[in-house]
C-alpha cells in the first residue's frame, strides 16, 4: 500500500501569466481604517483574529485593485473583510445555518430598511452605503445577482461538507465559480473604474469566454495554494485538488500538476478571446478595455499576494515561493 505523501510541489503559474503586477498607493491608510472598522465589531475569537491578521486581506485588495481611487479602494477593503467574516462563519456551519448567515447579508444588501439587529447586518449596510456612492444601476443590479448566487452556493457548500460529499468535476466547477466570491470581486470593477457597462457586453460569448477564463484562473490557482491549509482544517472537500484526486484516483502531486496544466489552458483561452473581442463603439470599448485590464490585475495580483501573506504558507511563504515545495500539515484540533 503506498504511503501518504509528506510534501508536494506547486505548479509554477507565474510564467503562464504575461501581466505586470502592481499595488495601490492608498494601501497603508485605507487598510488601517478598514481593519479598525472590522475589529470594532468584535466578531472574532482570538484564534480567528490571528488568522484574520495573518491573512492580510487588505494586501490582497492592494494587489488586485491597484488602480482604484482612495474611496473605492477603502470600500473594496471593507468588502473583502466583510466576505472574510461571512466565509469564516459559514465554513463552520451546517447548510441551514450557513443559509441563514448568507440571507442576513443578502437582505441587508437588498433593503436599506431591513435590520435584524445583528453585527453582520450592520456591517453589510455600512458597506452597501459606501458602494452606492459610486456604483451605477447596472453595476449594482449585477452585484446583487452575484450576491444571491454566492449565498446559495455557500449554503450548498455547507450542505455538502455536512454530508461529506465531494462533487464531480463539472458540478464542482459550477459551484466554485459562485462560492469563491470571485464574481462579486469582479463585480466591483465597474464601481472602481467609474463605468457602467451595458448588459449586452455580458451577453457576448467572446467577452464571457474571457471572463470565465479569468475567473477560473483565480479559482484554480487559489485552490492549489490554499489546499494544504484547508485539508489541515478539515474543509478540503471544497477544493479542486481534492476533487481531482477523487475523480481521477490520483495523489496530491498529480492533482497539483493537473491544476498547472489546466491553468495553462485557461490562460491560452483568455489571451485568444482577448484578441477576438468585438467592438461596441469607442466609449464602450474604452470601458471594456478597463474591465479587461482589471481582470488581469486580479489574476496576477492573486498570485503575488498568495506568497506575500502568511495565510496559506505561514512563516515560510517566501521559501515556498522560491522552491514551490509544500510540507503537508497534520489535521488541526479546533480549540475554539
Swiss-Prot record:
Q: Which controlled-vocabulary keywords does the entry list?
A: Lyase, Magnesium, Metal-binding
Where, by residue number, does Mg(2+) 1 bind?
87
Entry binding sites for Mg(2+) 3: 222, 226, 230
| Motif range (DDXXD motif) | 87-91
Give residues annotated as binding Mg(2+) 2: 87
GO molecular function list: alpha-copaene synthase activity; metal ion binding; terpene synthase activity
| Keyword Coiled coil among UniProt keywords | no
- The EC code for this enzyme is 4.2.3.-, 4.2.3.125, 4.2.3.126, 4.2.3.127
What is this protein's function?
Answer: Terpene cyclase that catalyzes the cyclization of farnesyl diphosphate (FPP) to various sesquiterpenes, including alpha-cubebene, beta-cubebene, sativene, cyclosativene, sesquisabinene, alpha-copaene, beta-copaene, cadina-1(6),4-diene, alpha-muurolene, gamma-muurolene, bicyclosesquiphellandrene, allo-aromadendr-9-en, epi-cubebol, cubebol and delta-cadinene.
Name the record gives this protein: Sesquiterpene synthase 10
Name its species.
Postia placenta (strain ATCC 44394 / Madison 698-R)
The upper taxonomy is: Eukaryota, Fungi, Dikarya, Basidiomycota, Agaricomycotina
Amino acid at each position: 500500500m503506498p504511503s501518504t505523501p509528506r510534501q508536494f510541489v506547486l505548479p509554477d503559474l507565474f510564467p503562464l501569466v504575461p501581466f505586470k503586477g502592481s499595488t495601490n498607493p492608498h494601501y497603508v491608510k485605507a487598510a488601517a481604517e478598514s481593519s479598525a472598522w472590522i475589529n470594532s465589531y468584535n466578531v472574532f475569537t482570538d484564534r480567528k483574529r490571528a488568522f484574520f491578521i495573518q491573512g492580510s486581506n487588505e494586501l490582497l485588495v492592494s494587489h488586485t485593485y491597484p488602480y482604484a481611487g482612495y474611496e473605492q479602494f477603502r470600500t473594496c477593503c471593507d468588502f473583502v473583510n466583510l466576505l472574510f467574516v461571512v466565509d469564516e462563519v459559514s465554513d463552520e456551519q451546517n447548510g441551514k445555518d450557513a443559509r441563514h448567515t448568507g440571507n442576513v447579508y443578502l437582505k441587508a444588501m437588498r433593503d436599506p430598511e431591513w435590520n435584524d439587529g445583528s453585527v453582520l447586518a450592520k456591517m453589510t449596510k455600512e458597506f452597501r452605503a459606501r458602494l452606492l456612492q459610486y456604483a451605477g444601476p447596472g453595476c449594482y443590479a449585477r452585484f446583487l445577482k452575484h450576491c444571491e448566487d454566492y449565498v446559495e452556493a455557500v449554503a450548498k457548500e455547507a450542505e455538502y461538507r455536512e454530508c461529506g460529499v465531494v462533487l464531480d468535476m463539472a458540478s464542482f466547477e459550477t459551484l466554485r465559480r459562485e462560492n469563491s466570491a470571485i464574481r462579486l470581486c469582479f463585480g466591483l470593477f465597474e464601481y472602481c473604474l467609474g463605468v457602467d457597462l451595458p448588459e449586452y457586453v455580458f451577453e457576448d460569448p467572446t467577452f464571457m469566454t474571457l471572463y470565465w477564463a479569468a475567473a477560473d484562473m483565480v479559482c484554480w490557482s487559489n485552490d492549489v495554494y490554499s489546499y494544504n491549509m484547508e485539508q489541515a482544517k478539515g474543509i478540503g472537500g471544497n477544493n479542486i485538488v481534492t476533487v481531482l484526486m477523487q475523480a481521477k484516483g490520483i495523489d496530491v502531486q498529480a492533482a497539483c500538476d493537473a491544476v498547472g496544466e489546466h491553468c495553462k489552458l485557461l490562460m491560452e483561452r483568455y489571451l485568444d478571446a482577448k484578441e477576438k473581442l468585438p467592438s461596441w463603439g469607442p466609449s464602450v470599448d474604452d470601458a471594456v478595455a478597463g474591465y479587461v485590464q482589471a481582470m488581469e490585475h486580479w489574476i496576477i495580483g492573486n498570485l503575488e499576494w498568495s506568497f506575500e501573506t502568511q495565510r496559506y504558507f505561514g512563516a515560510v511563504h517566501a521559501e515556498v515561493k522560491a522552491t514551490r515545495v509544500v510540507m503537508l500539515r497534520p489535521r488541526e484540533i479546533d480549540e475554539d
